[in-house]
């Protein structure tokens, strides 16, 4: 079971872990967007058998280039992952399996080490900004703002709202106002060409497809100001109502 902690908010890990335990299925946490997020006082990335983090530059903890990290509580997974990342080696010139060149280079490690000490502060700033956005947008007709879940810390890697109609028109008009907006993500996984062999077609997963048609990401970064958020929201409210 892969639990994707999308945009920095945890999935419902209590229910997921119950199902996994009942059927003896390992849980993999996709924590790529959830550096420092918590679920019931536990850090995201500490709940599954394996957890994956991304250090892509746009992430909450981003490298200078690219990178990522796997963490696990399972020693067998640990040993195999270490081999796979380094050409399948267990020692110098000793290759047990066919692996990859997936080592985090030292330059990226230095950048990440320097930025790590600021992560909690940046996460708090993102959380504060997300709450401010939510407070302004919570009652605006024509859109749905994120909901803050109890017993969780949302790090707002992305601040995404749902535009209930004419999203593409909203995007163009927001850009005319100088507001950069993006779609995360426009194509549901089951409709990606890479998975066409699975046999899915449009209409098979209507909720996923609806989300992809409505989702819109607003500007979000640790140092965004209240004035900037207010401007974004003022523009969005006028456009959505129009």
Locate predicted features.
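Active-site phosphate-binding strand-loop segment of PLP-dependent enzymes
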Residues: 1-63, 69-71, 217, 221
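PLP-dependent aminotransferase class I/II
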Residues: 1-4, 9, 13-15, 22, ...
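Short glycine-enriched loop/turn motifs at secondary-structure junctions
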Residues: 61-65, 152-155
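A conserved catalytic-core signature of glycosyltransferases
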Residues: 65-66, 107
């Amino acid at each position: 079971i892969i639990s994707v902690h999308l945009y920095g908010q945890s999935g419902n890990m209590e229910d997921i872990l119950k199902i996994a335990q009942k059927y003896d299925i390992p849980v993999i946490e996709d924590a790529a967007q959830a550096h420092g997020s918590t679920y019931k006082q536990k850090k995201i990335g500490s709940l599954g058998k394996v957890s994956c983090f991304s250090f892509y530059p746009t992430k909450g903890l981003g490298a200078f280039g690219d990178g990522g990290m796997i963490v696990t509580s399972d020693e067998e997974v640990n040993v195999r992952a270490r081999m796979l990342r380094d050409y399948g080696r267990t020692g110098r010139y000793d290759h047990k399996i066919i692996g990859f060149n997936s080592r985090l280079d030292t330059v990226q490690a230095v950048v990440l080490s320097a930025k790590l000490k600021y992560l909690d502060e940046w996460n708090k700033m993102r959380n504060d900004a997300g709450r401010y956005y939510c407070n302004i947008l919570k009652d605006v007709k024509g859109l749905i703002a994120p909901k803050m879940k109890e017993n969780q810390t949302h790090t707002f890697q992305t601040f995404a709202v749902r535009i209930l109609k004419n999203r593409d028109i909203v995007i163009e008009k927001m850009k005319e106002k100088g507001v950069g907006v993006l779609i995360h993500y426009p194509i549901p996984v089951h409709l990606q060409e890479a998975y066409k062999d699975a046999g899915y077609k449009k209409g098979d997963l209507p909720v996923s497809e609806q989300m992809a048609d409505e989702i819109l990401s607003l500007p979000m970064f640790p140092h965004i100001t209240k004035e900037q958020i207010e401007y974004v929201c003022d523009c969005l409210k006028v456009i959505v109502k129009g």
